[in-house]
């Protein structure tokens, strides 16, 4: 555990000392059910009071059961007790929060990231995103490492809640847009304050993609979410600019050797799988 704490502290310190860095960090916890009270206190004490955390919360009911059995507190109450919540902390999932936990996230201005495809894949349930947003929680759209195809996450979020509630009026396209564009940009701006993110204005970070998309019907600000959800695919992105630097042109990566990276990944994957299977065997 202490090696993990040192790694977090080292990475956070490195990004904080470089004002031009395009990477920022929060302290990476796993989940309440894998952390003792002593571990939470040690993690909190290892960094400054304005350092945020990211942590899986109530992804499955077992996380809540574990917290109640160990401490008598639900997950969010427990994290709050140990100083983990706050405006620079990101909680993931929140599938099984109760009303008090939702209110506590609002009161502490803690962020929540919604991962619809991951939750579907793990069969853990559906986060009550709409009621959370109405309550004032700043809900972002993430992917839990499921893949980097974020437009697929838009589509999953849009459809999942309709199917879950058996109501086509649920999860409006504007709600998906609010999470994926405006709230995600607002979260990024918490960590990158040198220039605005998510806006095309003078002085902002020049983060731009070019999309080879030719709509068959008019595209306006009013119907943009549905063009993204039903019309656009990640393969249509032809160029990517980050902070004014061209990283991909004509679908070719300019700063990375894709073939070399893929070959290296295939080379080391079996050893990673082997270590994982060995650890699983210890607890089975």
Walk through the language-model features, giving the residues of each:
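Thr-Gly-centered strand-to-loop micro-motif
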Residues: 91-93, 114-117, 141-143, 243, ...
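His/Asp/Glu-enriched, well-ordered alpha-helical/loop segment
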Residues: 81-88, 130-215, 232
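Short, electropositive alpha-helical surface patch
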Residues: 38-48, 105-116, 267-275
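Metal-coordinating catalytic core of metallo-dependent amide/deamination hydrolases
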Residues: 1-94
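Glycine-enriched alpha-helix->loop->beta-strand junction motifs that scaffold or abut catalytic
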Residues: 46-52, 84-87, 104-113, 134-139, ...
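Conserved short loop/turn motifs at secondary-structure junctions
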Residues: 28-32, 120, 192
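Active-site microenvironment of metallo-dependent hydrolases
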Residues: 181-284
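Catalytic core of soluble alpha/beta enzymes
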Residues: 59-83, 87-89, 94-110, 118-131, ...
